[in-house]
UniProtKB/Swiss-Prot annotation:
One of its GO terms (molecular function) is riboflavin kinase activity. Pfam families: CTP-dep_RFKase. Belongs to the archaeal riboflavin kinase family. GO terms for biological process: FMN biosynthetic process; riboflavin biosynthetic process. Its EC number is 2.7.1.161. This is Riboflavin kinase. It comes from Ignicoccus hospitalis (strain KIN4/I / DSM 18386 / JCM 14125). The gene is ribK.
């Protein structure tokens, strides 16, 4: 994938795609007619079933998570779909470069969808949620479909205030296991 990105940046996306596809064929993950092989399916199944480890540093947010998690439309769905009553706030983590890249493998996992809703005439969007653990504490990684955060920032919700429960401060390193 990095090779493909390199070629795209050099201005030849067709060559990049062709080389990427050729490497997948050589690894016997794709057939000549671009179907996923049994070996390719096994690899995808492994990606889906294994937890993804993301590492980064705790950073302060702007308080928006507190606002959104005070809305009953989201709270109710978290209780129903994730099985916990969320603390009204998120823990923001600035991922290291390797973890930022690894975050894209979440597309192989099936998200829990918190549906959008309207409250007091205002529309709130969908949020993708993935069960997770932070230092052994139950949590969920949440990805709002509309966000101002850059890709290297993730937000975590939990039944407890993660900062307090884990004695975290800005700059502390954490590992998040996403299931």
């Amino acid at each position: 994938m990095l090779a493909a990105l390199y070629y795209v940046l050099k201005g030849d996306p067709y060559k990049a795609l062709k080389e990427d596809l050729e490497s997948l064929k050589k690894a016997k993950l794709l057939t000549e007619d671009l179907r996923i092989t049994e070996k390719g399916m096994e690899l995808i199944q492994q990606l889906i079933s294994k937890p993804i480890s993301l590492k980064g540093k705790v950073v302060s947010g702007d308080g928006e998570g507190r606002y959104y998690l005070s809305l009953e439309g989201y709270r109710r769905q978290v209780r129903e779909k994730l099985g916990f009553d969320p603390f009204p706030g998120t823990l923001n983590v600035l991922l290291d470069p390797t973890s930022t890249e690894k975050k894209s493998t979440l597309m192989f996992k099936r998200p829990i969808i918190l549906k959008g809703f309207t409250e007091n005439g205002k529309r709130y969007g969908e949020v993708l949620a993935f069960p997770a653990r932070v230092s052994g504490v139950e949590a969920a990684l949440v990805i709002p479909l509309k966000t101002h955060h850059p890709p290297e920032i993730i937000e975590l919700i939990s039944p407890v205030e993660l900062r307090k429960a884990l004695k975290l401060k800005d700059g502390d390193e954490v590992e998040v296991l996403v299931y």
